[in-house]
Amino acid sequence: KEEAILAAAGEMAASPDDIYSMLNDADLKFPDAVAGDGEKHPVTHGTYIPLMQSYDRVLRKSAFDSLYSVYGQFRNTSAATLSAQLKQLLFYAKVRKYPSTLDAALDGTEVPTEIYRNLIDAVHRSFGPMYRYVELRKKLLGVDELHMYDLYVPVVEGVEMKFTFEEAKEIALKALAPLGEDYLALIREGFENRWIDVYENEGKRSGAYSAGARVHPYVLLNFKGTLDDVFTLVHEMGHSIHSYLSNTRQPTAYQDYVIFVAE
């Protein structure tokens, strides 16, 4: 009876995620960033990180202020949406009689809550190297105070690696060669048969994802030609081949996999 109620409430319970996705991916518009020489640069989810990698600190700060000032205008909307999401998770956990929402989230993954907490504790205990890195970055950049918009720019000037998508695919194939020709054949199939939505577009969500559809997986990218974009291509294709092999070789009941296995 309880599961029938939860199933009936499923679409309603998904509303917080739907609302935030529409706000973030479709409705938010950001002012142009202005460089030190006065040139204007459009700010979108896709252009933000490349702007953060500019050696022009004026441009970086302008892009940062552009993005976060708009998010700040909707902070109450975002807070209410997050609150609704938390209430949804708490509702499901209580109805299913879990001790906590953490227990509910980890159920089915075979990952004990102790592992989750130990991971966080280990990160907290290991902040020292990160603090030293931040101090080194501040010194190398020659700034008195390090800001969020100083964290992406290369600390060595004159190093700019840009790749076309065709070059990124070639790098991916070379990197994955040790996994064998059968694996490479699937990668090529994905490259040649439109599995990938490559570039940023208006209304397209930010980030990168792989969706393991039945016909074949689909990959969402927002490719800008950076080295990180090349890494992301390889990473997401890994998810896609995982899904493809699982879907073609496992019974339906066993095709899905948990996030801990995927990553």
Segments from the language model and where they lie:
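Long, K/E/R/D-enriched contiguous segments that form extended
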Residues: 136-188, 192, 242
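A glycine-rich phosphate-binding loop feature that marks nucleotide/adenosyl-phosphate handling sites
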Residues: 32-37, 91, 137-155, 189-198, ...
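Catalytic zinc-binding patch centered on the HExxH motif and its immediate surroundings
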Residues: 158-163, 196-216
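Helix-rich, well-folded core regions that mediate interactions or catalysis
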Residues: 82, 119-152
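Short pre-active-site segment immediately N-terminal to the catalytic Zn-binding motif
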Residues: 159-165, 171, 178, 213-234, ...
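Post-HEXXH active-site segment of zinc metalloproteases
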Residues: 243-263
